């Protein structure tokens, strides 16, 4: 049944798990994943069992995708800057149909548009007509009000969800307030020392980069020995923010999430003590920082907690 191939420049990467690899990515010519998104979503769909999977010893257990024994064929349609052309998307879906896939999983999309203008909806319709099951992501954001993308009735539309596992870190302020966040950082030796807080937004030299702790943007020597408050986003991955803080002499970091992500927090493998907090809690931390001449805080790490329904 399977008629697909691995492109000639990728044949040594294919095996009994990864049986197909093609690139339609704006003429790039290589199926290799440029930023990790494709690898991540492929492992979610069909990753094999991996015993002892963990991040710095956190969340230790057996990792697996939804269909761990399934074969995978990869069709790369997006560029590193996030561009995914309609022509590439349709060409990849057509190729997958011809190759004989059983299921199409697409973790990409945009704001809703009429079905007759939507390349994913059109391609998915053709696949469904040929007996192929099509599953598409509809985004990760919330709790803002919006219309779901990839909502054609012939598509299984899948939204982001949560689980009852957290990798908990707690911010303790000098006024004794505490705020729960998340972080995959795991200190070798617990440290409950209080350090002075430094707000990157209030001390910005570049309003488009400094608040987000973009690489090279933290030039104030006063950062040395302090915990830096950084805003999430700005096109800067969370771990890169931490590296920027570390390079500037900071000893820790608190990332304040965007309001559009609600209570969602990210547990990242940071390079220094760091924690991700919600926008609501971040607002309270900022209020404390601005209310005193010597705002201080410490970050403690509780590790993996199972069974948390919040």
PLM regions and their residue ranges:
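Loop-rich non-cytosolic ectodomains and luminal regions
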Residues: 1-310
């Amino acid at each position: 049944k399977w008629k697909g191939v691995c492109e000639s420049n990728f044949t040594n990467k294919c095996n009994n798990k990864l049986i197909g690899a093609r690139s339609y990515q704006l003429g790039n010519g290589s199926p290799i994943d440029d930023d990790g998104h494709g690898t991540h979503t492929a492992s979610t769909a069909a990753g094999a069992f991996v015993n002892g999977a963990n991040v710095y010893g956190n969340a230790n257990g057996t990792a697996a995708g939804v269909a761990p024994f399934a074969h995978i064929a990869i069709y790369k349609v997006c560029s590193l800057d996030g561009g995914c052309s309609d022509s590439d998307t349709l060409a990849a879906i057509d190729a997958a149909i011809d190759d004989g896939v059983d299921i199409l999983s697409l973790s990409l999309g945009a704001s809703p548009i009429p079905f007759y203008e939507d390349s994913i909806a059109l391609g998915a319709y053709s696949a469904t007509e040929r007996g192929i099951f099509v599953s598409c992501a509809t985004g990760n954001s919330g709790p803002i009000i919006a219309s779901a993308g990839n909502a054609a009735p012939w598509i299984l539309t899948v939204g982001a969800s949560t689980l009852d596992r957290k990798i908990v870190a707690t911010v303790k302020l000098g006024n004794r307030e505490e705020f729960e966040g998340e972080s995959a950082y795991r200190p070798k030796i617990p440290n409950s020392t209080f350090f002075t807080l430094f707000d990157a937004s209030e001390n910005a030299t570049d309003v488009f980069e400094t608040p987000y702790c973009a690489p090279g943007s933290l030039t104030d020597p006063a950062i040395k020995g302090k915990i830096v408050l950084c805003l999430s986003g700005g096109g800067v991955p969370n771990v890169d923010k931490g590296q920027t803080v570390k390079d500037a002499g900071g000893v820790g970091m608190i990332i304040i999430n965007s309001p559009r992500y609600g209570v969602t927090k990210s547990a990242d493998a940071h390079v220094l003590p760091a924690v991700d907090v919600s926008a609501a809690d971040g607002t309270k931390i900022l209020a404390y920082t601005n209310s005193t001449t010597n705002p201080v805080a410490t970050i403690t790490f509780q590790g993996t907690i199972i069974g948390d329904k919040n």
